[in-house]
UniProtKB/Swiss-Prot annotation:
InterPro entries: SAM-dependent_MTases_sf, tRNA_(Gua-N-7)_MeTrfase_Trmb, tRNA_methyltr_TrmB_bact. It comes from the Bacteria. S-adenosyl-L-methionine binds at D35, E60, N87, D113. The active site is at D113. Belongs to the class I-like SAM-binding methyltransferase superfamily. TrmB family. The gene is trmB. This is tRNA (guanine-N(7)-)-methyltransferase. It comes from Prochlorococcus marinus (strain NATL2A). Its EC number is 2.1.1.33. Pathway: tRNA modification; N(7)-methylguanine-tRNA biosynthesis. Pfam families: Methyltransf_4. It catalyses: guanosine(46) in tRNA + S-adenosyl-L-methionine = N(7)-methylguanosine(46) in tRNA + S-adenosyl-L-homocysteine.
Amino acid sequence: MRQHVNPLSQFFQLPLSLPSKNILFEKSHYPIHLDIGSAKGEFLIELATKCPDWNFVGLEIREPLVSLCEKKRRKLELTNLKFLFCNVNVSLDEWLSDLDFGQLKRVSIQFPDPWFKRKHFKRRVLKTNILNSIAKAMSKNGEIFIQSDIFELIEYMTNTIDENRYFTRKNVGDLRSINKNPYNVMTDREILSLKKNLLIYRVMYIRNSLLFTN
């Protein structure tokens, strides 16, 4: 399975109509945690098991991984979790617009593809349009949590979110001040990075009270 796919290729630019929350979940009124780049899904599977009064959505651009995650989910009979294939920069906004305002409580972006070459920065997942879509759907005190073991990437991500007026950084200053995953569940990459004694940079943003305007 390829580690990286080019989200700007023609295939991934085709918008997908994602299933609505009422189709995805039996209890569609529950608060939602959205994990962008859910990879093998172990983080959300454990979290969904521990938090039955939340709904969890994992979005992943590598379709074989989505199939693998859905197979695991069905085996565990988790009805508060779904994994979906899509390019979030193309298909997320429409799906979020279907949610009740404020239902989206948490968004996590953990160890995304770094795309090191400057000419490939535009392939990185976090962009202004995604942040605005999230800001439009999220009410005050909603969360965006990001983490990476690559300083240049976390710096890029924090700079991008800092420029957005709808989110306020909770831990200003030291990017290492959050010493563990705030949801008390670790991703596979997080576990591997800790075993290698790599520094992990974690940042939490809070949706402020500014009303969203286009």
